[in-house]
Design a protein with these regions (language model features):
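C-terminal substrate-binding/active-site "lid" region of AdoMet-derived donor-dependent transferases
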Residues: 142-147, 157-159, 164-219
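N-terminal signal peptide c-region/cleavage motif recognized by signal peptidases
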Residues: 20-22
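Conserved SAM-binding motif I beta-strand of class I
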Residues: 90-95
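Glycine-rich SAM-binding Motif I of class I
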Residues: 78-82
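Conserved SAM-binding strand-loop segment of SAM-dependent methyltransferases
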Residues: 112-124
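Conserved SAM-binding loop
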Residues: 104-105
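S-adenosyl-L-methionine
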Residues: 25-69
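Central antiparallel beta-sheet cores of small beta-barrel/beta-sandwich binding domains
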Residues: 218-293, 298-299
Length: 299
């Protein structure tokens, strides 16, 4: 497989972020002459760089902006993190190989983005990635915490190039992340979790040129009270089915879909659109050209 990073057979997702002040210099060895070799072995993997055109396409489909906190899993020579930082995002690379971490820091410094792009040496399997904190905190060896100035922010974008089995292992945890988190995987899918979008690099790419985007959906599985009716839902990733029962009248749910916290479905000829807000859903229903407000609460 090809990547701009090491793709570990035993990796999962990521560590707490480094501060922007220390991220470009912590542990750096300016005189190091290490250069990665295509095909070199890492932790259960080999390393091959991803074409920059695909890196750019992945960040484009994720709609990365300066408001994002991007975390790259197995960040290799740092090109994805550096590219995200060039877009103004705060970006963190997690990499197991310490030589690659130092190389990434040098590359970030050369690109002039050390204030936005940080890197740490870590096994992402041993981290609590949903609680990662951008800019404010990171974990030192021995679990000694260190804090820095900055505002906390959970990851909004995850980029990865892992083997299919690892994607499946990460999937349950990713699905429990904040709704709206964008996940972009180079080349490999998430099994039966259907991608929301698929893109290809158009130039400078001769292999492994496809990427998948998923948007983490809100969780709506269960029973909800919708006025005098009971809404029972069964969720499968960003899609759901179920029924809306009003007394003895039961209407099946059709076209149930979630995009982050946006929910849409049809029941009994009425189209419902709205937003999931924790234990409530609310929005507008349309039936026969007539609109009405609706609200449901989790039971």
């Amino acid at each position: 497989m090809q990547s701009s990073r090491f793709v570990s057979l035993s990796q999962a997702v990521f560590l707490l972020a480094l501060s922007t002040a220390s991220g470009g210099a912590l542990g750096q060895q300016p005189g190091s002459d290490f250069q990665p070799r295509v095909g070199q072995h890492g932790k259960d993997v080999i390393w091959v760089p991803t074409p920059q055109s695909l890196v750019d396409k992945m960040l484009e489909v994720a709609k990365v902006t300066p408001q994002d906190f991007v975390v790259d899993l197995g960040s290799g020579d740092g090109r994805t993190v550096i590219s995200a930082a060039r877009l103004g995002a705060t970006a963190l690379g997690i990499e197991y190989n310490p030589d690659m971490v130092e190389l990434s820091r040098r590359n970030a410094a050369a690109a002039g983005v050390s204030g936005k792009a940080t890197f740490t040496k870590a096994d992402i399997f041993a981290t609590d990635f949903p609680n990662a904190i951008a800019v404010t905190t990171f974990v030192l060896p021995g679990n000694a915490p260190a804090a820095f100035a900055g505002d906390p922010a959970s990851p909004t974008v995850i980029t990865l190039f892992l083997l299919p089995g690892l994607n499946l292992k990460l999937r349950p945890t990713i699905l429990n992340m904040k709704p709206g988190t964008r996940v972009v995987s180079n080349s490999f899918d998430m099994g039966d979790w259907q991608a929301d979008q698929t893109v290809r690099a158009s130039t400078d790419c001769t292999g492994y040129c496809r990427a998948f985007l998923w948007i983490v959906p809100a969780q709506v599985e269960g029973t909800w009270q919708l006025g005098e009716s009971q809404l029972s839902l069964q969720q499968r990733y960003q899609y759901f089915t179920g029924k809306l029962a009003t007394g003895n009248v039961v209407a099946p749910i059709a076209d149930g879909k979630l995009e982050a916290e946006r929910v849409t479905f049809t029941a009994g000829g009425t189209r419902y659109t709205g937003q999931v807000k924790g234990g409530t859903m609310e929005g507008t229903s349309t039936s026969g050209g007539t609109e009405a407000k609706w609200q449901a609460a989790r039971r």
